[in-house]
Amino acid sequence: MDKDSKVVIIGAGVFGLSTAVQLAIEGFKNVVVVDRHMPPVPDGSSCDISRVIRFDYADEDYLNVSYEAYLKWSKDPKFKDIFHPSSYILTGSMTGGDESWIDRTTRQLSNKGLAWTKLDDAATAKSAFPILSGKLAEPGFKGYYNDAAGWADATKAIIQLRDECLELGVSFISGPAGTVVGFDTDSENKIRSVQTLGGISIQGDHFVLAAGAWSSNLVPMYNSTLATAQVIAYTPLSDTEVQRYKKLPIYANFNTGWFNFPPHADTKTLKMAVHGRGYTRTPSKGEALIEANISTPRVYPSCERPNLCPSEGEGRLRNGLREILPELADRPFEKVTMCWHTDTPSGDFIMDYHPDYQNLFVGGAGSGQ
């Protein structure tokens, strides 16, 4: 690619911004990021108080990439106020169907010479982490923990990426002028420009679609992805409780999909979520560019995630909290909401050129990973 060519990136989340930074570092002089909102985009899946940083994967390639990322998060001084080390427990019940997944993960860790500690039962887990007061994943408990893990303050990370983009000369277009509603193509299905809600055309030589769950609004994904909303809750904590639970590990139950974070000191909340099949939403008529049976979040207005989630989802959140900290399980949540994921059948990312457009590269499908 000619480094004087213009690259237009659709989406100002972690995929789009990190792509922009890398292109600028490699010498591309004309990189433009377009989105409905300047980052951090308030309803984007990259933005919130926390995201898990781990390298525990059953797939060797994902483990290698995520381990490299973990080393950068944990050792690079620029992440000192963003990355927070924490132990990570992966557990579940052997009565479920996913027992082999934990075995494959620990085997990959061992093959790479990375430490992990087996947890034979709930009592062993409580001995290692006395703050866990619930019954945990019983009966048939199976699990392990890894001390080389942690979490990142996601919104702070996005702000840092945005500022790095600006320092490197990346341009941003937001608001109606940055809300993409269509493409102008030539006779060979090569995109010449994107059309926006504000009525302007943004020309480019190369285009990157990194719009997360909104991507299927713009191009057909041919059943390769499904946008799903996952439930999240935040329990308020007192100053004393923030200190009491500060050594709480990240605990993930692979049977239920429930997981938590340690307390977030800035907001004085304990965050938890469920990563499962999620909820879908059918767009209203005319909302999506693609006339197909798709699931998608609202396109506009771009706004903070609403304080609501299905009652069934709230029940799963409380059940998971009761599993590890029953003393907090009936406390009113400060907020419940939903985060939109782009899931693939295999849980793999998609990084490839779109089959319908010569110069459109699709990056994303994070699948909640």
Predicted regions and their residues:
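Active-site substrate-recognition segment that forms the wall
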Residues: 21-26, 81-85, 201-206, 213-359
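Dinucleotide-binding Rossmann-like beta1-alpha1 core, especially the glycine-rich loop
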Residues: 50-131
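Glycine-rich phosphate/pyrophosphate-binding beta-alpha loops
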Residues: 58, 149-151, 340-342, 360-369
